[in-house]
Curated annotation (Swiss-Prot):
This is 3-phosphoshikimate 1-carboxyvinyltransferase. Phosphoenolpyruvate binds at residues 22, 96, 124, 172, 345, 387, 412. The gene is aroA. PROSITE patterns: EPSP_SYNTHASE_1 (PS00104), EPSP_SYNTHASE_2 (PS00885). Monomer. 3-phosphoshikimate binds at residues 22-23, 27, 170-172, 198, 314, 337, 341.
Amino acid sequence: MKQLRLEPVVQVRGEINIPGSKSISNRALLLATLAKGTTTLTNLLDSDDIRHMLASLKQLGVEYRLSQNNTVCELTGLGGVISSDTAQTLFLGNAGTAMRPLCAALTLGRGEFTLTGEPRMEERPIGDLVDALKQLGANIVYLKNDGFPPLTINATGLNGGDVEIAGDLSSQFLTALLMVAPLAKGSVNIHVKGELVSKPYIDITLALMAQFGVQVINHDYARFEIPAGQQYVSPGKVLVEGDASSASYFLAAGAIKGGEVKVTGVGRLSIQGDVKFADVLEKMGADIEWGDDYIIARGAPLTAVDLDMNHIPDAAMTIATAALFAKGTTTIRNIYNWRIKETDRLAAMATELRKVGALVEEGHDYIQITPPVVLNTAEIDTYNDHRMAMCFSMMAFADCGITINDPDCTSKTFPDYFAQFASLKA
């Protein structure tokens, strides 16, 4: 197994242009596919999850051209639904942002589609989405365990009508349903059951749908009306914002050991909720400066926080390791959906934080972290989870440094993360 040793870093400074957002990249690729016209996507993320989406679209007959560095994609839309005369089997790795929306989109047309993935994907729930699609007439069969991939879709189109969907596990289910609703045979009325997690990710979805010319009436996130007879129309060009979750590591670095770290590609005008991570750093004591398309973090003594971070679940992971450098006990609450991500992130985070000496309480949907007087070096297991690897890079700011196991797992969203991280040394 590959290992990466991070030696202690005394101070950081620099500027990082953040790669494109995974969430925006895969949503925009699917909407461009369903749209009329040709769409040019710039600053597209070049990573495993996006490659799985692109490979599947190509297999389904979608035509596109990629630039040499894979960050500009010119895609010719189908002007409607995806259909296939032959049975198709699509392998989607561990890409939830490809599996969930494609599962929904493939019910719209005609054909037989089987969706598979890596072993971890078979442990990531999709039942809430499938239940909702079945209410609109979809024919979907599980091939192994009920509620989980792999699955086969026998597509004949989606009916309109009223549909209930659970919102308390993952916002990706609602996102997938929203994106396909305009192409159903009648108007769709979506009722959200339970607390809606990761609400800002729904805002990303709605903003992109509007960019492609579709209207959704949002009744305070409890009900969504999608009128029938709409069509996605390419806006011509779509600029993919930098990934705000990826920005969190560099902003935390600036807060802990700045110097001054500037991230570009996200800022005040971002449609991503994860930019609010910078507000949490500010609450902890960091000096934060906002521009329209940049954020600067400067170092200051950090103090612990006790916050509900349901709205920024991915970026909240970075607070867990930043807490090692804050005075007091940090509590991150309402984050049950960490458990159904690339790994059970609550269990994994608790295990690895204890290795470096932290006192950790792992609850059903919260984690509490008290840093030790002196941090220990350790070998950090990453669980094939890109965010675990990136979060624990913060341990480079301890006097002992850290060893990261399987550092290449960052290829899911940020293949050259550690090279960029190393560039910050003052």
